[in-house]
Amino acid sequence: MDLGPNQAIKTLRDGASWHGGDHKWSLPVAQPNGTYAPGEWTPNVAPSICNAGWHLTTQPALWWSHEGNVAAYLAEYVGATSAREGEDKIAVERCRLLRPLSKGELESCGIFTDGEHEVKTGSVYASGSASVTAYGSASV
């Protein structure tokens, strides 16, 4: 999935953080025309990766689960950021959720909930009726 400038992904369970926090997020609201009204901006927090700030990812499959009501959202952020070289996550000062990811976007990020899929590189998450064929040194 191609992300724009100052965009990343947030995975939530039942609309709340669940990897080291329990913040209840302001979720995007579906509009009659098929678009989404973004959620509210989070409060400002000085970011420090793994310690403080609003944590987002570029690889939601690493933060996914088949347990509970898990969803991934496109997020935009502003302000200071904190990250470690080569990691899949970033801590940001302030962000908001723009919309849920589509099934196709989830699949492009390696999250499969049904169907048959081939994976040649990277990390993926398969659940439900999905099946995945791995190639090379990959394993399922």
How should each PLM-predicted stretch be described?
Residues 1-139:
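Short, glycine-biased loop/turn motifs at secondary-structure junctions and
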